[in-house]
Amino acid sequence: MPQDKRNIYKIAREARGLTQEAAAEKLGISDSSIRAYETGQRVPPNEVVELMAICYDAQHLAFQHLRETNSMYGSIVPAVPDCSVLEASAKLINRIYEFADSHSDRRLMRIAEDNVIDLDERPEFDAILEDLQEIVEAALAVKCARQGGA
């Protein structure tokens, strides 16, 4: 039973306050399909997950699904934390200010201006990429954030 609680599809459905039957009806699929997805017997197709994200008002579900079912996606796109729009917005703005205040944008341009990243520049370039990855993660969190009162 604890394994069911960690199922991303079940968590999203329950957060919306829907029964399996109500969700199945809204999604136009069978109750048994919902059960199979939520117990891990079957992986829902992307089209069904897209409908779940809309029906459950859980945009982050689409990101979670892709990260869990597509290893290439998971290695490129950062995890999207489940947080409120206020938390996500504050984190995004803080990361942008930190990036600008550290003059990382200027350092990136200086490194890239000759179109070559040499061995001496590589550590700084990689550090800048990590900072940019944090900004991307924060922006995705804003996109998927829970709205106030939800």
What are these regions (language model features)?
Residues 1-15:
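A short, Lys/Arg-rich alpha-helix, primarily the initiator
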Residues 14-36:
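Short alpha-helical DNA-recognition segment
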Residues 47-65:
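DNA major-groove recognition helix of helix-turn-helix/homeodomain DNA-binding modules
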Residues 64-95:
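Short, charged recognition helix plus adjacent turn
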Residues 81-84, 102-124:
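Acidic, glycine-anchored loop motifs typical of Ca2+
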Residues 89-92, 112-150:
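Charged, low-complexity intrinsically disordered regulatory/assembly segments
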